[in-house]
């Protein structure tokens, strides 16, 4: 049976991961540990003989830089890459920038867990016209309709922007038998996992995607999922 492989990788640890802050769409770079995680992921993929035909990532530099580091390890810096805001992390609204422990003190542990892990609960919207964390103030989103840009998202809303992009841009490569790498974020990857694994809301609540660890999906010639596993 012909098998096509997809590699999903959450970016390496970011500076705000290290500081235990909600990041969302804020464009924070990798920490030193995050760069090391990306290098390790690249070495693991090289050891396992991966050769990619196409790459995808978000428009946030912690994911972009992770992909660059991985491709450098593979000596595939030439790989065609498509960047899309639809692969961005879930927008955490007013939580963006807050330390998670401080947020728990303010809102309560159960509320924060619902905002973080549930499927359809939305954190408070970000507000303030001059707020540096508002997407409409960012030039990288200048050509995107303001109706499409979120001010906060649940995982459900994240899935609703990720999966149409998956179907339109990524699946055609898989159906051609091409090997794809996607470097994205915890919740955009959780959205893909939910879709591919047909998980219900309680099942996706339990899913946590580690930073910098390759998650492999194998597909048959009809692009049906055969199996998935982490490479460590």
Swiss-Prot record:
Enzyme Commission number(s) of this protein: 5.4.2.11
Class of enzymatic activity (EC top level): isomerase
Pathway: Carbohydrate degradation; glycolysis; pyruvate from D-glyceraldehyde 3-phosphate: step 3/5
Keyword Isomerase included in the entry's annotation: yes
SMART domains linked: PGAM (SM00855)
Catalytic activity, reaction form: (2R)-2-phosphoglycerate = (2R)-3-phosphoglycerate
Keywords: Gluconeogenesis, Glycolysis, Isomerase
Gene3D superfamilies reported in the protein's UniProt record: Phosphoglycerate mutase-like
Residues engaged in binding substrate: 10-17, 23-24, 62, 89-92, 100, 116-117, 186-187
Family the UniProt entry places it in: Belongs to the phosphoglycerate mutase family. BPG-dependent PGAM subfamily.
Function as written in the Swiss-Prot or TrEMBL entry: Catalyzes the interconversion of 2-phosphoglycerate and 3-phosphoglycerate.
Quaternary structure note: Homodimer.
Protein name as catalogued: 2,3-bisphosphoglycerate-dependent phosphoglycerate mutase
Organism: Blochmanniella pennsylvanica (strain BPEN)
